[in-house]
Amino acid sequence: MNVFSKKVLFLGYGKKETSLINELKKVGCSVDFEKSAYFNTSGYDLIISFGYKHIIKEEIILDFKYPIINLHISYLPWNRGSHPNFWSFYDSTPSGVTIHLIDGGIDTGPILYQKYVDFDNNELTFKDTYERLKKEIEKLFIKNIHNIINGNYVSKMQTGKGSFHNKKQLPSEFKGWDSNINEEIIRLKNKKLKIISKKS
């Protein structure tokens, strides 16, 4: 199927939050946007998830005969799940961005494209690094947009255990995304050590 006849369902961020919807239209795709948990896959040639807050049900993944692609701001297999931008610094794991196929797990699908991103967390806030990661994954997508749309890629399985975090694991004492990364990580870890020492 020619790129210009592709009908794409874009899940998650809207036009004000990402440039990718317009980028897809520039190369001739017809794009519908959806952010709710419920959507109809009928008639689409490709589903793209970016900033989508819901888990796509396994029956949808199995029934949809075309690719479902996710854009995740972590260097998979590290930091699957929620708040990868926080956990990469807290756990001292690699930072980066990954475009991958969606399977039945959470951020466990085969990798299409990936980029490591390095930061100086002494000078940055979590918000700064989030915005940088978002820009990096958009650039990675745009660079490979024709291959992604036409399925001209070779996927590779994720290797290694990596890590996973859910929403509830974000520390309740976390001051927020405008915090200086280095200062906040030190503060949270010191607080955790004090709690452990009190219990022992």
List where the protein language model places each region.
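One-carbon transfer enzymes
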Residues: 1-200
